[in-house]
Amino acid sequence: MADLSQVTPVAFNCEGGLVLNRSTFMMKPGEALELQNFEPDIEGGYRRINGFSKYVSAVVPQTSASTEKVLMVCTFASKVVAARGTNIFTADAGGSSWTTVDSGRTSAGKYSFERFNFDGNDKLIVADGTNAPTVFNTSFSATDVSSGGGGEVSTAVTGAKFVTAFKEHMFYAGMSSAKQELVFSVPFDEDNFATNSGAGTIKVDDEITGLKVFREDLFIFCQNRIFKLSGTSTSNFAITAVTRDIGCINGDTIQEFAGDLIFLGPDGLRTVAGTARI
């Protein structure tokens, strides 16, 4: 056990920076009422932003209308990847133009994505909630993922909203025709769903709103429940309920923070550990 006999607590006040809860007559020297071009300093307080430059000088191209939203931004293979309208584009950092690497993604929604390496080659998989999930290699050659063929799982992964790699399988969820179902590929092959080779499906009793791998488990967030999948393959995959009383209303809020998972529940931000004790 550590010797704490020479350790004494020290109390100090966190002062300075932006103060909005005091009258200007009560503010001390060094406290600010309004800050422009400042950001939090990693050493405490605030620091002035000395300047900035655009990562890519050109805007992501529109495909049909200027009102189209940018639906995804990520980095892969030393490039910036962005989705807007019906297309996916790439650009070099510091570049001034975008290159189309995939098109025809009709009615695409907000994307989820996963970087992975199952066969010694880095890949990026994206899912938009409407079209087939698409895999890119480092040359940005696109391959659509499909399931439901002979000898494969019957549930098609086209229209998946969520995609994540777990225990060498690729997991898909959020299909409009199977909102309560989780589909996983065979080991080390994101586009193979042969049931006799290790692919399969898992059903829960609520609509899935997000997936997150945390430590050795895959957490399945639903509207009113949270489940946990453990194991490594079809032979020992096991699903247990974390809670059947509270769910996640927005899968984009699921984040790892301070050794736990946080998410937005119906009553605000919650931790999985705290929710499991309810």
Residue ranges: model-predicted function:
Residues 1-98, 153-227:
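N-terminal beta-propeller domains
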Residues 104-110, 149-158, 243-249:
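Short coil/turn segments at the loop-to-beta-strand junctions that recur within blades
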Residues 92-95, 137-140, 188, 231-234, ...:
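Short loop/turn segments that connect beta-strands within beta-propeller blades
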